[in-house]
Amino acid sequence: MSDTITLPEVEERTDERTKRQPPYHVILLNDDDHTYQYVIAMLQKLFGHPPETGFKMAQEVDKTGRVIVDTTSMERAELKRDQIHAFGPDPRLPRCVGSMSAIVEPAG
């Protein structure tokens, strides 16, 4: 008598619910009421970008009017957009009365 047990073949399935969610961009929009120093500090605090990356992003938003500062899940992108909106005015500019603006767009 053999002690070997043979199990039936099991077909592997990919559950549709486990597919990754599509990525979204957090896009910072330019304005004239915030300094490069403000942008660099905000990007460092909210996204962990080093000062060099923050400076490059500040240059791009100043030149083109917008810059992608993060690509992530929709939920995190919305949170980061809201954090940008709540970051507060630039204390270096007396005329500055509020935060910068940002939007969320599909990355595709």
Segments the model singles out, each with a brief description of its role:
Residues 1-108:
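Terminal domain-initiation and capping elements
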